[in-house]
Amino acid sequence: MKETRDPSQIRVVVGMSGGVDSSVAAYLLKQQGYEVIGIFMKNWDDTDENGVCTATEDYDDVIKVCNQIGIPYYAVNFEKQYWDKVFTYFLEEYKAGRTPNPDVMCNKEIKFKAFLEHAMSLGADYLATGHYARIDRSGDGEVKMLRGVDNNKDQTYFLNQLSQEQLAHVMFPIGDIEKKEVRKIAEEAGLATAKKKDSTGICFIGERNFKEFLSQFLPAQPGNMETMDGVVMGKHDGLMYYTLGQRHGLGIGGDGEPWFVLGKDLERNVLLVGQGFDNEHLYSTSLSAVKMNYTSTKKLPGKFSCTAKFRYRQTDTPVEVELLADGRTHITFAEPVRAITPGQAVVLYDGEECIGGGTIDEVFKSNEKLTYVG
């Protein structure tokens, strides 16, 4: 439904991270006349690898920006929910030899569930965040989620698990602005975060040495690196540290093309490797997905065509989607795709609209399951 009330009658809670995107989101809403409250979420209790408590620094920046804008602010703590719903899943997936996407789960369970419920308990009409995505309320009562205008920053890939009910209460104030314009707005407004660099770490955990961090929670089990023919090429540090298509960190010398991770043999604790970026073993023609979510409540046909992304910032691939009787979804690619990775998200699009997504579970080539992939 299109919003008809005057902005001054609408209360919006903004999830503020201490970064420039959420700062500008709050600033724009305030400029547009909404009643705005800034809330900082603390979901992880730790210091980064330099001994700095990044959450404290980030909250200090939130306070500065909220004072500059002239809005109330406070912090909420969802550490237990984050551990139970996101981090436990993250570790379980790595244990199973897969490569999880914690940002997708964090958006589903924390930002747009626990935090959205908290915002609603404060009498908020909407929760706003600094995501690069757009909301379209102009249709037939259903809300659509569209790609962000800045194609390089579009974050609908990470928002694929949001439901119609969640989207009805969400605003993305910077979704129709390019990143460089967001920086410009922040600088012109004199916001404290205008020149702060973007974070690139794990959702809420921050930037740190990934191997060191993961080894605190999961014991590493070194083993052999082998070719598909069983030739031992060296040792790996633990299967959880590697992902499909990875080149760096293998330490295999010699002549010829670079070496890449082709798969994992979990039973033997072997990392499968091969030469060449376009190694045939890296390519597949279809996948099966689980935990599919569709943003619309309308019934889907049993088969339909659309486009898909299998990783963030990837160009769309035309696909055929088939809903199977057992609840799984089979997705066939128009042409073979490289390094489809179990545990990662597959996200579906109809033009500009993100129509949903799920988790890659099994990978196939010419209808034959690739057992070495996951």
Swiss-Prot record:
It comes from Lysinibacillus sphaericus (strain C3-41). Catalyzes the 2-thiolation of uridine at the wobble position (U34) of tRNA, leading to the formation of s(2)U34. InterPro entries: MnmA-like (IPR004506), MnmA-like_C (IPR046885), MnmA-like_central (IPR046884), MnmA-like_central_sf (IPR023382), Rossmann-like_a/b/a_fold (IPR014729). The record marks 131, 344 as: Interaction with tRNA. The gene is mnmA. The active site is at 106 (nucleophile), 203 (cysteine persulfide intermediate). This is tRNA-specific 2-thiouridylase MnmA. It catalyses: S-sulfanyl-L-cysteinyl-[protein] + uridine(34) in tRNA + AH2 + ATP = 2-thiouridine(34) in tRNA + L-cysteinyl-[protein] + A + AMP + diphosphate + H(+). It is found in: Cytoplasm. Its main location: cytoplasm.
